[in-house]
Amino acid sequence: MADEALQHTFFA
């Protein structure tokens, strides 16, 4: 999974 995807998920 892309790192940026996780940031947009958890760091909303």
UniProtKB/Swiss-Prot annotation:
Keyword terms of this UniProt record: Heparin-binding, Lyase
pH dependence: Optimum pH is 7.2.
Temperature note: Optimum temperature is 45 degrees Celsius.
Regulation: Inhibited by Cu(2+) ion, lead and some agents that modify histidine and cysteine residues. Activated by KCl and by reducing agents, such as dithiothreitol and 2-mercaptoethanol.
Keyword Lyase attributed: yes
Its EC number(s): 4.2.2.7
Coiled-coil region(s): none
Domain of life: Bacteria
Catalytic activities: Eliminative cleavage of polysaccharides containing (1->4)-linked D-glucuronate or L-iduronate residues and (1->4)-alpha-linked 2-sulfoamino-2-deoxy-6-sulfo-D-glucose residues to give oligosaccharides with terminal 4-deoxy-alpha-D-gluc-4-enuronosyl groups at their non-reducing ends
Keyword Ligase: no
GO molecular function: heparin binding; heparin lyase activity
The record's account of how the chain is modified after translation: The N-terminus is blocked.
Function in brief: Degrades heparin and heparan sulfate.
Protein name: Heparin lyase
